[in-house]
Design a protein with these regions (language model features):
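Flexible "cap/lid" loop of the alpha/beta hydrolase fold
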Residues: 10-15, 22-50
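Conserved alpha/beta-hydrolase catalytic His-Asp/Glu region
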Residues: 36, 52-109
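Conserved loop-alpha-helix segment in the C-terminal half of the alpha/beta-hydrolase fold
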Residues: 112-146, 152
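Gly/Ala-rich beta-loop-alpha elbow adjacent to hydrolase catalytic centers
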Residues: 1, 5, 9
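Nucleotide-sugar-dependent glycosyltransferase donor-binding/catalytic pocket residues
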Residues: 31, 49, 97, 122-125, ...
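Generic structural signal for small/hydrophobic residues in well-ordered secondary structure
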Residues: 27, 79, 92, 115-118, ...
Length: 168
């Protein structure tokens, strides 16, 4: 799972452990803390705010280690593709009202896990990366010159690590 998908992967592995042999996490978000519900109407306002073009552009740039070199119109379009989906705003508002992902480290079991994180991840931040690095069961790999998207910032290296992990 990538980013919040990492929390989803951990929860799924906890719920159906016999169906999962290994997990790969890419810059997993939501491992620490407690869920914090954002009540109506703040959840709706927040979802609308996150749909603003300047906010989308800023979030997209934060995801990359070197945004001046890596972020163009195509990356901004990809980061905003969900805005074209019917119901995206209400779905995001509902997710915010639910409390989102937090504290999912409690789902870490004895399933092998490898975790790739960019050392320049400005979404998770240095404190979160340090906390992730300190969870022994996560088999942490820190990637230099990489942001929140190892599979995009360093696709060849990330795919090699992932392939080697699943073939071992």
């Amino acid at each position: 799972g990538a980013s919040m998908g990492g929390s989803t992967a951990l929860k799924l592995a906890f719920e159906i452990p016999d169906s999962i042999d290994k997990i790969i996490l890419l810059s997993p978000a939501g491992l620490f803390g407690e869920p914090k519900s954002i009540p109506f109407p703040l959840n709706q306002i927040g979802a609308s705010f996150l749909g603003l073009p300047q906010v989308r552009k800023s979030l997209c740039r934060q995801a990359f280690a070197f945004p001046d070199e890596c972020v163009g119109k195509m990356e901004e379009q990809i980061a905003s593709i969900h805005l074209g989906c019917k119901g995206w705003r209400n779905s995001l508002a509902s997710f915010a009202k639910s409390g989102g992902f937090a504290g999912t480290q409690k789902y870490i079991q004895n399933i092998p896990i490898k975790t790739l994180c960019g050392e320049n991840d400005r979404i998770l931040g240095k404190k979160e990366i340090k906390n992730i690095r300190n969870i022994e069961k996560l088999n942490f790999v820190g990637l230099q010159n990489c942001g929140h998207l190892p599979h995009i910032d360093l696709p060849s290296l990330s795919s090699k690590i992932i392939q080697d992990y699943f073939l071992e």
